[in-house]
Amino acid sequence: VQGMMLLIVPYMAMAFGAKESTGVILPMLCMADIMAVAYYKRIADWKTVAKLLPTALLGFLVALFVDKLVPAQGFRQLMGWTLALAMAVMIWSEIFGKENRWMHKWWYSALFGLLGGFTTMIGNAAGPVMSVYLLSMRKEKMEYIGINAWFFLVVNLLKVPFQIFAWDNITWGSFSLNLLMLPVIGIGALLGIRLVKLFPEKAFRRFIQFVT
């Protein structure tokens, strides 16, 4: 569940530094994504993934540019307001049972792809962005998981060269720590698969909203 990653990010930032922690976390995310795709490989709406990826890559470039201009506090405020607005759209749809009238517009997916690419590059924090997007699109549980698994695998693998060559955040030392964490990541993946099976559709949506 991508939104739960935000529980870990602050502690990693305190331990390794805000920017440096993104390079420590990224290989672990890639490992988890590979496990998720291995299990859910046949469940994906590729049309939705394809709508998100082009502007997600643009979000990478925006993040690299803005990183030099905006302080960390500014990023947190920007992300907070963006997520609050997106959550309001989703909650309105849930309470009043109305379809999001923007969901079929080309710019809606493009906007969330851009936000996802930007927030994942800055702080590995795109989980809530994608959660809000997919829930507002009223994706069912397994479709939600399949899209998330493939989108984040592709996006996180594409981030690796940026983290190595642009920000120098991934080193042999940090990667050795990632390898030590591999068994724990595997256990977490198995628990996540089990947890998903226990949730009925409506309870799953409520759980995602809560962790987001």
What kind of feature is each model-predicted range?
Residues 10, 63-68, 132, 193-194:
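Small-residue-mediated transmembrane helix hinge/kink sites in multi-pass secondary transporters
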Residues 1-50, 112-113, 127-185:
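Small-residue-rich hydrophobic segments that form or flank transmembrane alpha-helices
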Residues 190-211:
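Interfacial loop-to-transmembrane junctions
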Residues 1, 103-117:
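Small-residue-enriched transmembrane helix starts and helix-helix packing motifs
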Residues 28-31, 54, 58-62, 78-88, ...:
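Lipid-exposed faces of alpha-helical membrane segments in multi-pass integral membrane proteins
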Residues 33-43, 78-104, 193-194:
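Transmembrane helix exit motif
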Residues 64-77, 97-100, 163-176, 198:
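Membrane-interface helix termini and inter-helical loops of multi-pass transporters
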Residues 17-18, 71, 140, 200-204:
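A helix-boundary/kink motif common to multi-pass secondary transporters
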